[in-house]
Regions:
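Active-site neighborhoods and metal-handling regions in enzymes and metal-associated proteins
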Residues: 1-373
Length: 373
């Protein structure tokens, strides 16, 4: 068996397992089929094999996937997309094409004809039952964990490699360009680029690249996607001695991060984790900081599947990815981690950069410090 054939067989097995989850959901709601149009769900159900983006900023793909309770699978697309989708995306995955002229989008008609009258959908469409499929994507399967680790390792390596190239005088736009180029040449797509220089890091939680020029302090904060899986990481660089106040803030952020990691256990709710963060900020003497930015949460096929909220009801799954991002006054801790077998694995660890270690309950949790070249 060729490598490509083996990969298709492994993907097909993963798809079958996920089809079982879909079948249970369809039985629960009385649906005859499910229609996926959102990127995260298309990537999930196709084992990360299908990249159906043309416009990078859209939430929906150039095709929709119809999966029936009887086990048939279709991709619905305009005729002009058909050849590429057949050759480069769906080959070997067991999906049948349903094509329409690009001048007349009949996705709804084709879906009902092939899937029946009662269809759940991940986008709001007349004649379909709109549903949030996020809970279906957890827990992660072993193959997904393997891919997540691979993507995280590549994104982390790019982050460290590019961070080390920053020097005083670099612009925020150039910072974004360098990390983007490094990722894209490895077939990894950046989805969030937050590059801050000096005072902008203190003023804005989401420092999108603007006219800033690095003097002493720089932030490289990104999310990047491959195989449908999204990795989040933030790292900082400082030229000259690190101010004591900033160093203290990184220690505080690292402690809040450690407390969140320690509390990230199967069954914990979004509200439980928000309370942990709130308590951490209060203990750090900055109780109001939690109101200035979200604290992160579960991730996987989106930058965040959900964030911790005071009244959040989502629950942590036994095998799930998370990206917490506690921050205060110029400092932030952010890594992508995996909860598996009751333990936390930091997927974006950077041991060659400064590390802050926090001990909680006999366990050591590590966050990144500031790189001082």
């Amino acid at each position: 068996m060729t490598t490509a054939a083996l990969a298709s067989e492994v993907a097909a097995q993963e798809i079958e397992t996920k089809q079982d989850r879909l079948n249970a959901l369809m039985d629960e709601h009385g649906w005859s089929a499910v229609l996926f149009s959102r990127h995260e769900n298309i990537a999930w159900i196709t084992a990360g094999r299908v990249e159906a983006r043309v416009a990078l900023g859209t939430e929906t793909a150039v095709c929709s996937l119809l999966l029936t309770r009887q086990g048939r699978r279709f991709y619905i697309a305009p005729e002009n997309e058909g050849p590429r989708l057949a050759a480069e995306e769906f080959s070997g995955l067991g999906f049948e094409p349903l094509l329409y002229p690009w001048t007349d989008n009949t996705t709804d008609v084709l879906a009902h004809k092939a899937g029946g009258p009662e269809i759940g959908a991940d986008t709001a469409m007349p004649g379909f039952y709109h549903h949030n499929f996020t809970p279906l994507r957890a827990p992660l399967l072993s193959a997904e964990v393997d891919r997540l680790r691979q993507v995280a390792a590549a994104v982390t390596a790019s982050t460290v490699r590019v961070l080390r190239t920053f020097t005083p005088g670099i612009t925020e736009d150039e910072m974004a360009a360098r990390i983007s180029a490094d990722l894209l040449t490895r077939h990894i797509t950046p989805s969030v680029l937050l590059m801050g220089a000096d005072e902008r890091i203190f003023h804005y939680k989401h420092a999108v690249p603007r006219a800033g020029v690095l003097k002493n302090y720089g932030m490289l904060n990104l999310c990047a996607r491959q195989h449908g899986l999204v990795i989040s990481i933030t790292r900082f660089i400082h030229f000259g001695p690190l101010p004591a106040v900033l160093a203290a803030n990184f220690e505080k952020a690292a402690r809040i991060n450690a407390e969140l990691l320690h509390a990230t256990r199967a069954g914990a709710t979004s509200a439980d984790l928000y309370a942990v963060a709130a308590k951490g900020y209060a203990a750090a003497g900055v109780p109001d900081e939690i109101a200035k930015h979200h604290q992160g949460g579960a991730c996987g096929y989106l930058e965040r599947d959900w964030v911790a909220l005071p009244d959040g009801t989502e629950r942590v799954a036994p095998t799930q990815a998370f990206a917490w991002n506690p921050s205060l006054q110029g400092a932030k801790a952010e890594d992508t981690v995996l909860l598996r077998d009751g333990a936390i694995e930091i997927l974006t660890a950077t041991p060659d950069l400064p590390v802050i270690e926090i001990s909680i309950g006999g366990k050591i949790y590590r966050s990144a410090g500031v790189y001082l070249p």
